[in-house]
Amino acid sequence: MSDVTPRSRSLFQVSVAVAVIGVLAAALLNALHYVQEKAERTVMEATVRNMGKGLEIELQTRVIRGRPGSSRELVGANPIQWLESPPEGYVGSCGRERAPGEWCFDVASHEVVYRPRLTASLEFRTAGRRELRWRVGSADETAGGQGANPMATGAIGLVSTTSFVWH
């Protein structure tokens, strides 16, 4: 005779079902975290791209108004001013500590700062960094900083001052 009772068979089936559900839940949570990080990266990249486009519009506006020489005044400016509305999490001038998901403008370094919420796929090339930074600068002053600079000599653009890779 078999020692397996209907009750022990039922407990075994429930145990297997719970284990399968646990594995599936873990996989789904991992996938959700991955998607959330990719969404954060996409929003951050769109915000930076929009700041760059806003700068280009400001530069062209100055040319149209006959003031192309005044473009140099934009070096070190806060590019958030050229967005229709500030990004979610923008707090103005940077404080001492920055919360994850916070954007601010560092008045001392003239850089826009973003502290990512999720960083599992983000690799900072400088040890101890936890934030991303950009600056309105000229090709002349930034050429030595981050490797190959796509801007023409004397051109003004939005450049990253943080060396990072977001996989």
Describe every region a protein language model picked out:
Residues L55-Y90:
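Short, glycine/small-hydrophobic-rich surface segments
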